[in-house]
């Protein structure tokens, strides 16, 4: 270390630009990651991802009720303008049912009357 008055520390001569070159990409990365994690919501003590689109693209209008293991009815909302009915079959396959089909309406009504055990 020098005690001369004309000596300049290396800290004062370094440019702040390398720090900015690191902070800018880091801040851009964080701005893309934070909104992606905000889509997760805590429901009944577990984490569930909130989809902001309709889940059912194609629907089936005819299925035998004995093939259905469970049924999930998703109301229309900001995520989707229509009601969605998703059935989990006994072979663990999930299919979307047409909520407007008379047969599907009867299946949903029967399950709701039975106490919603297949909800």
Swiss-Prot record:
InterPro entries assigned to the protein according to its UniProt record, in alphabetical order: Chemokine_b/g/d (IPR039809), Chemokine_CXC (IPR001089), Chemokine_CXC_CS (IPR018048), Chemokine_IL8-like_dom (IPR001811), CXC_Chemokine_domain (IPR033899), Interleukin_8-like_sf (IPR036048)
Signal peptide location: 1-33
Primary location: secreted
Superkingdom of origin: Eukaryota
Any single Gene Ontology cellular-component annotation: extracellular space
Compartment(s) of residence: Secreted
GO terms classed as biological process: antimicrobial humoral immune response mediated by antimicrobial peptide; cellular response to lipopolysaccharide; inflammatory response; neutrophil chemotaxis; positive regulation of cell division
Gene3D superfamilies the UniProt entry points to: 2.40.50.40
CDD domains the record matches: Chemokine_CXC
Cystine pairs: 54-80, 56-96
PROSITE patterns recorded: SMALL_CYTOKINES_CXC
A GO MF label: CXCR chemokine receptor binding
Propeptide: 34-39
Sorted UniProt keywords: Chemotaxis, Cytokine, Disulfide bond, Growth factor, Mitogen, Secreted, Signal
Pfam family, one: IL8
Function in brief: Chemoattractant factor for neutrophils.
Sequence similarity: Belongs to the intercrine alpha (chemokine CxC) family.
Name of this chain's protein: Platelet basic protein
UniProt organism field: Sus scrofa (Pig)
Name of the gene this protein is made from: PPBP
